[in-house]
Amino acid sequence: MQSLLCSSPGLSNVLDDPKSAGVATFVIQEEFDRFTGYWWCPTASTEGSEDLKTLRILYEEVDESEVEIIHVPSPALEERKTDSYRYPRTGSKNPKITLKLAEFKTDSKGKIVCAQDKELVQPFAALFPTVEYIARAGWTRDGKYAWAMFLDRPQQRLQLILLPPALFIPVPENEEQRAEFAKTVPENVQPFVIYEETTDVWINVHDIFYPFIQPEGEEEELCFIRANECKTGFCHLYRVTAVLKQGSYDWVQPYVHSEDDFKCPIKEEIALTGGEWEVLARHGSKIWVNEATKLVYFQGTKDTPLEHHLYVVSYESPGEIVRLTTPGFSHSCSMSQNFDMFISHYSSVSTPPCVHVYKLSGSDDDPLHKQPKFWASMMEAASCPPDYIPPEIFHFRTQSDVELYGMVYKPHDVQPGKKHPTVLFVYGGPQVQLVNNSFKGIKYLRLNTLASLGYAVVVIDGRGSCQRGLKFEGALKNQMGQVEIEDQVEGLHYVAEKYGFIDLSRVAIHGWSYGGFLSLMGLICKPNVFKIAIAGAPVTVWMAYDTGYTERYMDIPENNQQGYEAGSVALHVEKLPNEPNRLLILHGFLDENVHFFHTNFLVSQLIRAGKPYQLQIYPNERHSIRCPESGEHYEITLLHFLQEYL
């Protein structure tokens, strides 16, 4: 197997070894949540009288020879070595990609008789010239087609493609052999573009695609369920029937791309859900399709953007959507294989997580309305620590007429008329929601610690955060760093007016990653609002970040020079305060995501501008602090800086 699938000699030097097979690249893993590069066909085809079975693996082959190499300090610092990575910075070249098939035959005893590497009958770049990323791939359940989700470079067009195995030919040794192999591919064998999504914002890639098995005699159509955010601006489920319209292609001749080639007409597209709320699709969210009862189970925010619930709807005659989980909590659910049970991991701001199993009971004649009954507990909620006081969720309408949600941790020693120093904890970027009705006392326990020490802590999900629709999240398009601080400051003033315990002359802004970037941006744009900023692992110059993330939200640099400059905090250090002890920067030296270069460059600019700053480096940490001692040190550093200078 190794010799079949490895397209490279596996050299240790990244410069000498630019090719890989079956492995997702850094950007694909980090920015598209795809962590594999190969997909087993679920069925084996039997051929001939010798009882030979053909097994197939679809895999991605990647050539990174034109991708920049960057050097990150190695964890083995005492050896003074660096780790080398291929890292495509925004605007630079991405890897060249293609899809291939590994095909092998086994005898009746399961022994591999022969193996063959296959490639597409025409070069990938010729068949799909606008495709930059293979976001997802897999097989239909009957193994008749491989499928893939293709994205263009601006990430504004997604195509869902079917690839019949017959479209792949053995890897030829020369052009003459390629022509011979191509002759064996029938003219009506082709890729099918069964679905397209386009937007002028960006595509949020997800996993939800459920192709039904084609009924006997209806091979010219494919029915599937797909989640689509682009149609209405909110992610919803659709049942789609595509007609597999066949053309005629001479695969021996070089293929010349035409815009409408391979496109399939949509015979029917029925919305199963709708409204100003979202079906959860990103970050590994699933749907569960019961073909016997014609029901689809999904998770969504139909009741409130602050809670995730499990719902069910008929995909045959959609209409009523039934919620299966208890309101007042946010749930993360999974259905059993035979759809009679589900498990929920749920919590609220005031209730720690518990895990319960529920059985659906009721009439088989009306499966949509089966009611969940408590069946078993796998984990009961632990009791809160005695000094834990949950945050209070609030909402307000901004001057630009947008409803925003936030949460506030009240100082534990709050008294009427007393004003408290305040920490505005921020993330503020896309794909993240901090404010919801789930328990915060584990991941964000330090926010309660701050409240116990007399600080007020405020958290606001402004425009650009997720779970509120594409227009809301898309407020950041081409202007990262230019809208978020306004929402944070408006929320801060709302809390100050509503609760009366915030000392607006003593406000700190603090966050990590995108939150670190916004902490710096807050001190640059609103130095009269924020007395101090504590920025963890900040992006300081967007030109140094990767293609997949940066171009999705900011376009390529040459198309958005103004946006890149306005959003790069290291280019605006002259606006930072001249007073000492107002800026603390924290960064892991081994950060593989937001490279230490960002802090290095920022500090160089600060020194050139004669601006004061404090810097805390974590020599053995990456993008997230993992070592408990480092975590403790960070918390003490944070507290000390707040106590001394806020």
What kind of region is each of these model predictions?
Residues 2-122, 169-184, 364-381, 434-446:
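Predominantly five- to eight-bladed beta-propeller fold
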Residues 44-51, 168-184, 216-220, 244-265:
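Intrinsically disordered, low-complexity domain-flanking/linker segments in eukaryotic proteins
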Residues 54-62, 66-69, 95-98, 122-138, ...:
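Non-catalytic accessory segments flanking enzyme active sites
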Residues 103, 161-166, 238-241, 314, ...:
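Structural recognition of the beta-propeller blade-terminating site
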Residues 166-168, 232, 240-246, 251-252, ...:
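Alpha/beta-hydrolase-fold serine-hydrolase catalytic core, especially in secreted/extracellular enzymes
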Residues 213-238, 289-292, 298-299:
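Loop/turn-rich, solvent-exposed surfaces of beta-rich toroidal or solenoidal domains
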